[in-house]
Amino acid sequence: MADITKQDVIDFIANMTVLELSELITELEEKFGVSAAAPVAMMAGGMPAGGDAGAAEEKTEFDVVLLTSGDKKIQVIKEVRAITGLGLKEAKALVEEAPKPVKEGVPKDEAEKLKAQLEGAGAQVEIK
């Protein structure tokens, strides 16, 4: 058996179509009994009992929320697909149902980068 490096696997996956990649993910989920869905953090139950003590802490995770797609809806859909890895149908639905979060729980620098990327495509974006 030939030695296959991690880079070989990455290169192979990079050349797959979205449909092939989706099928691969499904097969891997079934084989290993896992889910590729990102966990959603519950904010309501995690509030500190100290009241103002929580307000003093600096927020470290941010949500990038798409407010509107503007005039360049197709460009925004392309950017949403690139950012989230969603399929065309899912990305289109997300853009059409705005305001919707595009990415949740990201560091501030990444949130700013994503906001600039989406605004460059013509969208109105908010960081929460």
Swiss-Prot record:
Q: What lineage does UniProt assign to this protein's organism?
A: Bacteria, Pseudomonadati, Thermodesulfobacteriota, Desulfobacteria, Desulfobacterales
Q: How does it assemble?
A: Homodimer. Part of the ribosomal stalk of the 50S ribosomal subunit. Forms a multimeric L10(L12)X complex, where L10 forms an elongated spine to which 2 to 4 L12 dimers bind in a sequential fashion. Binds GTP-bound translation factors.
Q: Which GO terms describe its molecular function?
A: mRNA binding; structural constituent of ribosome
GO CC, any one term:
cytosolic large ribosomal subunit
Against HAMAP family, the record matches this protein to: Ribosomal_bL12
Q: Which Pfam families match?
A: Ribosomal_L12, Ribosomal_L12_N
Task: Enumerate the UniProt keywords alphabetically.
Answer: Ribonucleoprotein, Ribosomal protein
In Swiss-Prot or TrEMBL terms, this protein is called: Large ribosomal subunit protein bL12
**CDD domains from the xrefs?**
Ribosomal_L7_L12 (cd00387)
